[in-house]
UniProtKB/Swiss-Prot annotation:
Disulfide bonds: none annotated. It comes from Arabidopsis thaliana. InterPro entries: F-box-like_dom_sf (IPR036047), F-box_BR-signaling (IPR050942), F-box_dom (IPR001810), KIB1-4_b-propeller (IPR005174). This is Putative F-box protein At4g22660. It holds the Pfam family Beta-prop_KIB1-4. SUPFAM superfamilies: F-box domain. Residues 7-58 form the F-box domain.
Amino acid sequence: MEKNQNPNTWSDLPLDLLNLVFKRLSFANFRQAKSVCSSWYSASKQSVPKNQIPWLMLFPKDKNNNKNSSCTIFFNPEDKDQLYQTQDLGVEFAKSVCLATYGSWLLMQDSKYNLYILNPFTYEKIGLPAIESQQVGMVKVDQTIDDDFLTFDDHNHVKLFKGNNTVRTPVFWIDEKTKEYIALWGLGYWCVVYAKNGDKLWNQIPEIILDSLDMVYKDHKLYSFSYRNLFTILDFSGEIPRKAFQCFMHVYRSEWLSPRSRQLSNSWCVAETKLVVTVTGDVLLVERMLRHWSRIQSFNVYKFYSSGTFLDKYELADSLGDEAMLLDLGITVLANEVEGLHRNTIYFSDSHDTTTKDLFLFNYETREMEPLHKFDFDCSLLELSARWFLPSFSHT
């Protein structure tokens, strides 16, 4: 039988076909495929990995003693044998704290408490107005020589905030292509402020939201609930925010026991109360429960807002269905659309005294914590701050 003198090879696959292949690959498989040959590498430049499983960022806990400026580690649960580490992002990044994430972008606060948005994969950086640069409104802010902040309301009431306690419940959104963005945070207990592209000052939202216990920004809407038991939805689709919904709600908040009682007690405490917006737009109230002595955690999930209606009686959810909850982001995603993502599971990070041994998922069906992964790297990085995020990737 005569041999085919012109056999087709992997390198000869049409570009259109390669593009279809690349669009279906996860991040780990995408990285492997682009290294097959030069033609595949060229084709990969016209594609990006599909929207995938959430990643976990691991930051050193002690920023003051962090002399390694390239120490942030990324863990992809889909590719458990591989840890990714950023290149040198500079001393400023090493001394900064991550406050929130959106896509591949991080909202950071540096050692002088200045805010900026950073993409650790492309190294793009967007500066934000200084905290004390506030639009004339109900609150005035001055920075002290110790980098703390004095706030004055319109009745001349004064309150001192330590620098790292001034920015509360921060959230942001950014368009990956146009870099249009909005950043929002609670100014102490006074009000909520926001800034968009080109703003030199933070805009105060007068009287609508006076303080914030937690906030979620999704689909140009800000969801907030406050220490005053107010649940509010603000619509940011126009030039100025518009109140779309507001009502009183009951939030159970348990005060921490005294240090001595805390050591002796192993009863459940409400360690954190969070808002979560589902795929369909329902709003959930999530209580993270903690047995302090044993460090065992559990979660209660309540539905209290659905289809534009506030539910007088909160419904305790017995299941998350086919969705997975990303508690750090305040959202749920469909697990069956993301390979490797577990349905009916809560992905969370504990910002207090976290080590690699304390990273778990919570299976809402079995009501049990499951270890995320057995990490194996330099013990100098074991004291960590961890945060989940949903990266998206450009043509790199």
